[in-house]
Amino acid sequence: MLTLSTNIHDGRLDGSMAKLPGDLARIAALGLGGVEIGIHGLDAIRCGRLDRSRVEAFKAIWSEYDLALSFHAPDTLDLMARRDHDVHLQVFSSCLEFCSLAGAKTLVVHPGRWVPETDFGIASPWTPDPTAAREAMETEARTIRSIAGQFPDVVVSLENARTFLPYSPHTYAEFPELLLAQVERIDLPHVGICLDTGHLHLASRLHGFSESHGAALLAPRLVHLHIHDNFGRTGYWSEKNQTGQVPLGRGDLHMPPGLGDIDFAAVVGPILENFSGIAVCELRGRYLDALGEHIEGFQRLVSGLRAPRPA
């Protein structure tokens, strides 16, 4: 069964659950079946440790709503981290425990990076040689297998990565074939792939591979979808202001489908025909005022792509 969902931006919550009831009620009223929430927006993990009182506070709110729940791990989580590696492992474990306690079936995780975003502007662009890259990926795979193996009730969904100038490729996950290989290396039935349409659009344009072929490569291990739009123009890591980026069409804009130039029929059309997971319309907070209009467009898009084709 396909479940349509949207996200509550972590910056909107910023550690407070006060807005959750109203946001959840609004999402349910729009006819959506799910919601995705950044765990980091709930202020439930501090220096790797899970605050179970925050979990209970969340559950008390969540129990009032009949929505499918997915969580997004902190963007800063890096299972290849060379600095504070043990803390990153604690964060990953705490995220999975939060999911298990709250009843969330899916945790979206950004795969390990050669250069983490937290080091942009400090570290130089760097990509390991093939041997070092393989060893790092094997270590990450063992880490995920060990920690995720303790939470078989939670699906870990590794997300294909966005691109940044001048650091890309800053992670193997910019390349669909390498992300697929990593999931197969992990070899757990509850570890799969989150296809992010915006990230794929950026990576395909920057690296020169076929967008639809990249999506098709990931399809066999696909467990989760992030659907949003952009113009496929990679920006510099320092370009953070959406008000300035949108006029130039640069970066990971997380716009409603139809505002950019992604060919959704070619990229996700074939996937949606048989997909039975959660498809999240993952938008930036700046689109919240017109959320109803944007979700209607998202619902029409998905319905049209899943409609039977003429014989």
Which residues are covered by each model-predicted region?
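Histidine-acidic metal/acid-base catalytic patches
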Residues: 1-2, 17, 25-28, 97, ...
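N-terminal pre-domain/capping segments
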Residues: 1-101, 192, 299-311
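Active-site acidic/histidine proton-transfer and metal-coordination neighborhood
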Residues: 64, 81-192
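Active-site beta-loop-alpha junctions enriched in small/polar residues
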Residues: 7-11, 38-42, 74-76, 112-114, ...
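Hydrophobic residues within beta-strands of alpha/beta enzymes
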Residues: 35-37, 107, 156, 225, ...
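Alpha-helix N-cap and loop-to-helix initiation/capping positions
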Residues: 15, 19-22, 46-54, 83-94, ...
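Residues at or immediately flanking beta-strands
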Residues: 34, 68, 155-157, 190-194, ...
